[in-house]
Regions:
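Glycine- and other small-residue-rich loops at beta-strand/loop junctions that grip anionic moieties
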Residues: 4-8, 30-34, 84-91, 113-117, ...
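Glycine/Thr-rich beta-alpha phosphate-binding loop at enzyme active sites
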Residues: 1-10, 41-42, 48-108, 144
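Glycine-rich phosphate-binding active-site loops on the catalytic face of alpha/beta enzymes
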Residues: 48-63, 117-118, 123-151
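Internal active-site segments that recognize and position negatively charged phosphoryl groups
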Residues: 27, 31-45, 57
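C-terminal helical cap(s) of enzyme catalytic domains, especially alpha/beta-barrels
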Residues: 63-83, 128, 139-165
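Short beta-strand/loop segments at the ligand-binding rim of alpha/beta enzyme cores
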Residues: 21-32, 104-115
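Metal-dependent enolase-superfamily TIM-barrel catalytic cores that perform enediolate-based chemistry
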Residues: 1-22, 31-32
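Generic structural signal for well-ordered alpha-helices
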Residues: 12-17, 39-43, 99-100, 124, ...
Length: 174
């Protein structure tokens, strides 16, 4: 699976090197958090030429089981139970940890994308403090609509003005 391959820095580095040979645009690599070696794999990918690396804002789990037909998946596009990806606010502490570990091991010169559980400007500031250069948001936009983005940016600017912050505090905790 992608999750098991993503734990092998040498294998994923080979893929990154080949992609970099074929493209002329920046390459952002989204890592699997499964396996617990995310910072070390990120290090190998930066060495292979990745322009940015980030943790995946989800975790694998078993979806709810249909108690009336346990072998049938609850998702209509699948015939049987399989792993599903879970994300949203509960994941933020894990996403912060992944971001922090990637920054701590790889230093300030490497771009990090962070995703997982950002629902307001405070969550975004925490991601930046743990080392993010860029933040990805999905679940909250799906829940609240695109206007969420403008609100988040306005609140972030207000926070920065109040605290007289001119940059995004990237890596403040590392």
């Amino acid at each position: 699976t992608g999750a098991s391959l993503g734990q092998q820095g040498d294998a994923v580095s080979e893929i990154v090197r080949e992609i970099k040979k074929a493209i002329s645009i920046p390459l952002f690599v989204k890592l699997t958090p499964e396996g617990g070696r995310i910072a070390q794999v990120a290090k190998a990918l930066y060495a292979a030429g990745a322009d940015a690396v980030g943790g995946t804002a989800n975790r694998l789990g078993i979806p709810p089981i249909n108690l009336d037909d346990p072998g049938q998946a609850i998702y209509h596009l699948q015939k049987e139970i399989s792993m599903s990806c879970y994300s949203s606010a509960w994941l933020k502490p894990l996403a912060l940890r992944d971001t922090y570990e990637i920054r701590k091991v790889n230093g300030p010169g490497n771009m990090i994308t962070a995703t997982g559980g950002v629902r307001n400007y405070r969550d975004a500031v925490e991601m930046f403090m743990c080392g993010a250069d860029l933040i990805g948001i999905c679940s909250e936009i799906l829940r609240s609509g695109y206007e969420f983005i403008g609100d988040l940016i306005a609140d972030l600017k207000k926070y920065m003005d109040i605290h007289k912050i001119s940059d995004l505090l990237t890596g403040k905790l590392t």
